[in-house]
Amino acid sequence: MSVDLATVKRVAKLARIAVSEDEANRMVGELNGILGFVEQLSEVNVEGVEAMTSVTPMAMKKRADAVTDGNKAADIVANAPVTDHNFFLVPKVVE
């Protein structure tokens, strides 16, 4: 896949980014370079390599799958200026 000038301009318009003609021309080369690198990555043989989300092992602490209120309601509203039964009260802004 390659990117042309029309594609860069279209993406810039969709993203609502002002791009000059010189910047758009430069981006064509940069984006094609990035896509070329991604294509190289797709050629790498990863057969037998275990998928991972991090380079360091991260063991997640297991907990019971039970519904609770979190027992944090008082802590959450502690700094609120006005509360009512652990709910935030806010001034009325719409008439």
From Swiss-Prot:
GO molecular function, one term: glutaminyl-tRNA synthase (glutamine-hydrolyzing) activity
Record's keyword annotation contains Amino-acid biosynthesis: no
InterPro entries: Asp/Glu-ADT_sf_sub_c, GatC
Keyword ATP-binding: yes
Function: Allows the formation of correctly charged Asn-tRNA(Asn) or Gln-tRNA(Gln) through the transamidation of misacylated Asp-tRNA(Asn) or Glu-tRNA(Gln) in organisms which lack either or both of asparaginyl-tRNA or glutaminyl-tRNA synthetases. The reaction takes place in the presence of glutamine and ATP through an activated phospho-Asp-tRNA(Asn) or phospho-Glu-tRNA(Gln).
NCBIfam families listed in its UniProt record: gatC (TIGR00135)
Similarity annotation: Belongs to the GatC family.
PANTHER family: GLUTAMYL-TRNA(GLN) AMIDOTRANSFERASE SUBUNIT C, MITOCHONDRIAL (PTHR15004:SF0)
Cited HAMAP family: GatC (MF_00122)
Name used for this protein in its record: Aspartyl/glutamyl-tRNA(Asn/Gln) amidotransferase subunit C
